[in-house]
Amino acid sequence: MVSQALRLLCLLLGLQGCLAAGGVAKASGGETRDMPWKPGPHRVFVTQEEAHGVLHRRRRANAFLEELRPGSLERECKEEQCSFEEAREIFKDAERTKLFWISYSDGDQCASSPCQNGGSCKDQLQSYICFCLPAFEGRNCETHKDDQLICVNENGGCEQYCSDHTGTKRSCRCHEGYSLLADGVSCTPTVEYPCGKIPILEKRNASKPQGRIVGGKVCPKGECPWQVLLLVNGAQLCGGTLINTIWVVSAAHCFDKIKNWRNLIAVLGEHDLSEHDGDEQSRRVAQVIIPSTYVPGTTNHDIALLRLHQPVVLTDHVVPLCLPERTFSERTLAFVRFSLVSGWGQLLDRGATALELMVLNVPRLMTQDCLQQSRKVGDSPNITEYMFCAGYSDGSKDSCKGDSGGPHATHYRGTWYLTGIVSWGQGCATVGHFGVYTRVSQYIEWLQKLMRSEPRPGVLLRAPFP
């Protein structure tokens, strides 16, 4: 029995001397069960050290418990190839498993450090994402933003005016009365009363006014400092906008029926028509200039430039609105959603006029949207390229009679600009209709040329346009 077992063991172990030893044991007839075994010249068993020299193989610690223990990342996925399900058992979390599997299954795509200029890399499946520092952009953060800034993209980062030409870096400029700061994009005032600023708010560390003029609010005193009130024979005529100490912009249709030009007065710093508070300044209008293309009784080219008899004095309550450069107005200001209109017009259609200056925040519309909305109520207004629509179609808010000629003022990065002139509309705050404004950007060069030219005789002049 022992002999058979020994032979089987020898065969399994493949030991040549083992069988011979077995034969000796059998021949001697010794039974290990009956008497103690003594070492002899032929041994069946070897020492542990000798056995290890023949049978030794590497084993993982606790290998016999492998199926009983929770998964180990080292054991399952690094010593051996693991599956997604095995990795999921290890992490116990789908998101962490996905992050591991991306790197495990196709390698770390960030290993080559593809992100430049200090960018950080995030590994993805067969891809990667670079998170760039603020001054850089591109797939690998390889491009400095300053090298790619163009004026059509957020005004090139400029606070006011932007210029660029093919093959050159964009440059920022500032309006008259401002200077460019060292950062190359910001503008700072160089005069006490620069255009487009509201001194009352500046001193309160605020930036925008609180706030037709149907459904609007009272413009707090001093918060619409460029607003002009035009009077003829002492009666309210229209509104206007101060653009420097001697020039005012208004609507041409306001002067269709004027006969006594010497009684045309512009009032600055006005707020409440029922009282005089000492901040008002009155100037006689010396000249009214309208485009040669304007036809009385119509709405196209509805703009007028007024020269005052004497310059006004700039104060906290009398400040000009900036007349923007044309490209800046068309490329940037035209896409500012909301702007302010102001005036002392009727508070309701055919109602009483306002005693206090009113202001309203109105949204600007694309011309096509304006036409589509108007057609829904059976109207087909003639909106030319010299006009634009703004306001609300629900009949709640609008400019109205008496507001004509007043400003449509647009705020951009801390400064206000003249973008429109209150012109015409179908009634006041009529459902389905919008207010129509003269598009000032079309007349920038015309206005600037007239303001640079020598005064000509006459009160009402027609100047060639364009």
Curated annotation (Swiss-Prot):
Top-level taxonomic group: Eukaryota
Mutation effect (F388S): In FA7D; reduces tissue factor binding; impairs activation by factor Xa; abolishes amidolytic and coagulant activities
EC number: 3.4.21.21
Residues recorded with modification (3R)-3-hydroxyaspartate: D123
Keyword terms of this UniProt record: Blood coagulation, Calcium, Cleavage on pair of basic residues, Disease variant, Disulfide bond, EGF-like domain, Gamma-carboxyglutamic acid, Glycoprotein, Hemostasis, Hydrolase, Hydroxylation, Pharmaceutical, Protease, Repeat, Secreted, Serine protease, Signal, Zymogen
PROSITE patterns the record matches: ASX_HYDROXYL, EGF_1, EGF_2, EGF_3, EGF_CA, GLA_1, GLA_2, TRYPSIN_DOM
Domain Gla: from-to ranges: 61-105
GO molecular function annotations of the record: calcium ion binding; serine-type endopeptidase activity; serine-type peptidase activity; signaling receptor binding
Pfam family, one: Gla
Locations listed in the record: Secreted
Site feature (Cleavage) residues: R212, I213
Start and end residues of each EGF-like domain: 106-142, 147-188
Main location as per UniProt: secreted
Disease linked to the protein: Factor VII deficiency: A hemorrhagic disease with variable presentation. The clinical picture can be very severe, with the early occurrence of intracerebral hemorrhages or repeated hemarthroses, or, in contrast, moderate with cutaneous-mucosal hemorrhages (epistaxis, menorrhagia) or hemorrhages provoked by a surgical intervention. Finally, numerous subjects are completely asymptomatic despite very low factor VII levels.
Record-stated family: Belongs to the peptidase S1 family.
Subunit structure: Heterodimer of a light chain and a heavy chain linked by a disulfide bond. Interacts (activated) with iripin-8, a serine protease inhibitor from Ixodes ricinus saliva.
Chain's role: Initiates the extrinsic pathway of blood coagulation. Serine protease that circulates in the blood in a zymogen form. Factor VII is converted to factor VIIa by factor Xa, factor XIIa, factor IXa, or thrombin by minor proteolysis. In the presence of tissue factor and calcium ions, factor VIIa then converts factor X to factor Xa by limited proteolysis. Factor VIIa also converts factor IX to factor IXa in the presence of tissue factor and calcium.
Name by which UniProt lists this protein: Coagulation factor VII
Lineage: Eukaryota, Metazoa, Chordata, Craniata, Vertebrata
Gene: F7
